[in-house]
Amino acid sequence: SAIVHAAEVAGLTQFVNRHPQGFDMLIGERGESLSGGQRQEVAIARAVLMDPPILLMDEPTSAMDFSTEHQFKLRLRQHAAHKTVVIVTHRTSLIELADRIIVMDDGRIVADGPRESVVEALQSGKVGRAQ
């Protein structure tokens, strides 16, 4: 089903399967019974379930540990192979998902281009702060 697929992409499957009530569990107001990472996974699953042509994610892994984030990146790459995904993040570990990177500083674009070009410019110090 679409719900199971969305849960798989978001990384919720194991958590849901361990819970005695499964998908019928109560999670409380604003997900208060969930960890920060689980709340992010629920939000991601809800977005995936809508199947939008463009998926906008703001700091989608900020509450995830390294292992959880790594598994999420693998699942997202497979799910979003033919979609436009915009990720707003401070985590450089998500750069590998990008075809294009836009770097902003103080509300201004200071770099924009293919991932390899922007990463090279950043590493060589060719990208400065906004003036």
Language model features with spans:
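ABC ATPase nucleotide-binding domain helical subdomain, centered on the C-loop/LSGGQ "ABC signature"
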Residues: 1-29, 73-74, 82, 120
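Conserved catalytic loops of ABC-family nucleotide-binding domains
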Residues: 78-87, 95
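A short, proline-enriched helix->beta-strand linker immediately N-terminal to the Walker B motif
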Residues: 49-53, 82
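Catalytic Walker B motif of ABC-type/P-loop ATPase nucleotide-binding domains
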Residues: 55-58
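Helix N-cap at the start of a conserved alpha-helix in ABC-type nucleotide-binding domains
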Residues: 66-67
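ABC ATPase "signature
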Residues: 112-113
